[in-house]
Amino acid sequence: PPRSTLFPYTTLFRSLIARVPARQVVLEGQTSWIPVPEGKGADDRVHTAFILDMSAPGVQVRQRCQFEGCRGIENAHLTMQQVRVPVENVIGEVGKGLKYALTILNVGRGISIPAICLGMAKQAWQPTLDRANGRVTFHKPLAERQTQQIRLGDMAGHLFAMEALSMLVWRLADQHRHDIRIEAAVAKIFCSEHTIRFLRDAQILFGGMGYETAASKMARGEAAFGIEQLVRDAEMYRIGEGATDILRPFIVREGLSHHLDRAKPLYSGELSILDQLKQLVKLGGFYLPWYMRHWLRQPLPDDSALAHPQVSPVLRYVERTSRRLARETFYAMVRFQAAFQDEQRVQNRIESIGEDLLALVATLLYAEQQTRLEGRTTVWELAEAFDVAARQRISRRLHELRHHRDGITGTTGLQALKGYYPGLSSGIVHRRLDDYRRQAAVSEAIPMAMASLSVPMKDQGRLNLP
């Protein structure tokens, strides 16, 4: 079909689930945001990607979805009734749709989202500096206040780290020799989370004008920089291509998959006592030397960049902390055993520590490269600012791996889900989530009732409608 009839509201149907007979696919169901139908003939064992002609009979766009930010997103609520898709519209091989989708996700996570986030942060950087230098409060520019100097220094260090980590992952992707699933996910989390924080800090420096839209400021001749739009847009990149809360456990499980597979027979519950003892001896034979090795300092690779006097001390810290993280992870696996798969209190901290360690390595090597190739010696100040912040986070999270109070807050959250704290909703007009659906239905019904009554517009306000 002509290009104009393809995807007017969606960019790609990546993993529609359907059986593919000899000549055509029949689709039935409805979708929102990511099109995955539930209908006759659907088989969750066969994920096949194909192009859907949006002008095909039975395809109907019910609604163009609207979002907090990124107003140009072409996502929609679609319905499909007996839609027939020619088999020549299948992309690649039948049953390989999920594989294609996950491959595309690596590109989005590791390349697209870090690039977008980095661009947004860079776009906000110079206007934020100009605001800090130009805004005077109580006869003193914001730039002369320690609170704002610390805030801007932290922003600068993390902006440099985002660029360094992104460049590292992009180089790995360009080589086409590496499985970058973990690195892509880490880059996505790091850049999206720190961009949100970066932009919110910038908005704080703009004060009330940071909450005002660019169009409103332009109307009276102010500098029409839309920091509020960047803040709204950035939230999407925390969610898109894998939400942070999903990716953190994913990274840990991917990174530890060979350890989890090694211990799986022991926790399966299918072994006799004798077989369990044999399995323990086998695991001990592997993990005893592994554990002892992680107490011993490992030499850094022989490379001039790693031997740089400002790089090597940080890399030794990363090497030392990586061994400690490996030991702490081993303790956690022994402590929680089979339950470790769902122990997100520990998994999230393990991922966060590893994320900062990878970003530290990328930042120091990027600073060395910038100095060697471009003579930019000021980058060491940026690297040091990030180093300070990252080490503080790492130290805190290492401590929390064994000493945290998440059990208390987790129990409170569970009790809240069971309805134990009704007083938290007191003092307002109480509504449940479904009440807003009914409210929307009433709002749609009122204009139709007005039209059916044929009441002049000037008199509609006098009607006493229920």
Which sequence ranges carry the predicted segments?
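Short, small-residue-biased leader/transition segments that mark boundaries at the very start
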Residues: 1-12
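Extended, hydrophobic alpha-helical segments in both membrane/secreted and soluble proteins
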Residues: 13, 101, 114-128, 132-227, ...
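A short core secondary-structure module
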Residues: 13-61
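Glycine-rich beta->alpha junctions and the first turn(s) of the following alpha-helix
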Residues: 60-159, 235-240, 253-256, 268-355
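Generic structural signal for well-ordered, non-transmembrane alpha-helical segments
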Residues: 119, 150-156, 160, 185, ...
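C-terminal helix-coil-helix/basic helical segment that borders enzyme active sites and/or dimer interfaces
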Residues: 159-192, 203-213, 337, 359-391, ...
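Glycine-rich phosphate/cofactor-binding loops in nucleotide/flavin-utilizing enzymes
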Residues: 209-307, 406-466
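C-terminal catalytic subdomain
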Residues: 243-260, 347-365, 371-374, 379
